[in-house]
Amino acid sequence: GPGAAGGALTRPRARGLTGAGRTPTLRQVSLAEGGSMMGGMPGQAPVMVVNQNAQRETGRKAQLGNITAAKAVSDIVRTTLGPRSMLKMLLDAQGSIVLTNDGNAILREIDVAHPAAKSMVDLSRAQDEEVGDGTTSVIILAGEMLHCAVPFLDKKLHPTVIIRGYLRALEDAIAICDELCYPIAEDDEKQLSNIVQACVGTKFTTRFGTLISDLAIQAVQTVRVELPGGGREIDVKKYAKVEKIPGGSLEDCRVLKGVLFAKDVVAPGRMPRKIERPRILLLDCPLEYKKGENQTNVEISKEEDWAALLKAEEAWISARCNDIIKAKPDLVITEKGLSDFAVTFLARAGISAIRRLRKTDNNRIARACGATVVHRTDEIKDSDIGTGAGVFEVKKIGDEYFSFIVDCDAPKACTVLLRGASKDILNEVERNLHDAMGVARNVVQDPRLLPGGGATEMAVATRLQEKAASVPGVEAWPYRAVGAALEVIPRTLAQNCGANVIRTITKLRAKHLEGEGAQTFGIDGNAGTIVDMKELGVWEPYAVKTQTFKTSLEAAVLLLRIDDILSGLSRKGGAGSAAPQKPTTTTGDDVDSEQQLAE
């Protein structure tokens, strides 16, 4: 019992130590009673003492809980794989409806509570940012890898042994992909179009596959920059902007060789709205009198002082405008403000001006027309002026005015203009276009292909089953399980188009066992039949496929390593701390980013 101190930690007492095979009974004391985190008799294992309000799962229970949560997430997106995929209708927090079959878009809208499920959602986001495609496949594969580990956990096989087998299988799977891949010529436009169309063929916009693939390829080829060292940079996210304007039809979508943004000139009546071969000046400084960083008090005793103050402001703005006029630009675009006095000066000189443009758009214009963003007007050089644009024009589309800086000579930035009947359709087309541009970028950077339609997965699975015989010890079980897990992709493709799954997969497995020449056979996602992907023309980029294998297997390994899940109401609150009447949720800095009730 407690000593004289009253609040000291009660030490765990062992009972029945003389009895053979008996284990000591340990008593836990909560931190709220004044205990410390650790306690224990000499020679005994220390006892972790936690808040009574906290929930804790350890050992096999934690592992199975993680696997169940991950499998539940993968089952959500399983029906969205392949050309016969189903759509998901999601109602987001703002009340708007999202219709999509994109794995990342679905999981982004779902609010999950389990930490393992959250890690699966992050997995999809990581895949999307890394290669732009394969978000659904990576979730399905990760869930299946974890599901295949359950029998080994039931047999009390240590997670480290399972992980060792999994990682060994991953190394061999990548090596097999290296053997299976087909190199293509970098300038083979037809082959590149077929690959991107195969990606778009699984999306909502299948009917417009050719249109979207053409848009994606044009955008990627426009922003492609050859680096001095021999490599190439293709920054689609930064330099290929997608502008959605409701109205018209999808056939009106096009890639603009330049930049489009929703702005009008500052003084429409006095500034020209169309300029051929414009000289463009880009600024990152305000053309209005800059207020002091700190609060400034000016004491004015007579009217002349006030007039002098206004004159000083006008002189400052006048000096800046004169610096600009000396450079003889036709169009001035600034990221900051533009005062009425400056507008008068510029309009009198016949210069069009646009203010408060986003920095990202300004950088895009600089890259498209060869300009340099200037930070001070007294530092403007003639080389800073962009002369590469063909035309600047302001057009009214619907109720909004849009500025076009297009027909650039050598644009390294572009805008994809999307038109469509409604915002929902435009949002889905944008998601599909993002995936298509990711695929096109991957092929241009790494021109190697792997057969699609589950052919690569089945070929790797067959080879892993053969190699498993040479793996020593119990590691061979999880090694073989990776091969079995990879078959989930062709199985899901067959399932989603209503084919007899068992019969189809058995035939495909037998076909792949025939050896050379049979490794390109997979599932036709439209009919559910077994066909040669080489003849069908369904290919996937090597970068996407190998990244899918790596990401899914490493995520499965990460979740298998977890043997303890501790979650409480609050990090700071002790036992019995009362919750507020209207609790609010905060993400905090918890290890699993779980939502917590504020104190």
Predicted regions and their residues:
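Extended, low-charge hydrophobic alpha-helical regions
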Residues: 64, 111-113, 412-599
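Extended amphipathic alpha-helical scaffolds
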Residues: 21-105, 170-421, 425-428, 592-599
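N-terminal charge/polar-biased segments
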Residues: 1-56, 559-599
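Active-site cofactor/substrate anionic-group-binding motifs, chiefly glycine-
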Residues: 96-127
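Residue-level signature of catalytic and energy-coupling elements of molecular machines
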Residues: 82, 132, 156, 216, ...
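Glycine/serine-rich anion-binding loops at beta->alpha junctions
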Residues: 57, 127-137, 449-451
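Hydrophobic or amphipathic alpha-helical targeting/insertion segments
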Residues: 145-187
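Glycine/charge-rich, flexible interdomain linkers and switch-proximal surface loops
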Residues: 86-97, 137, 183-196, 233-243, ...
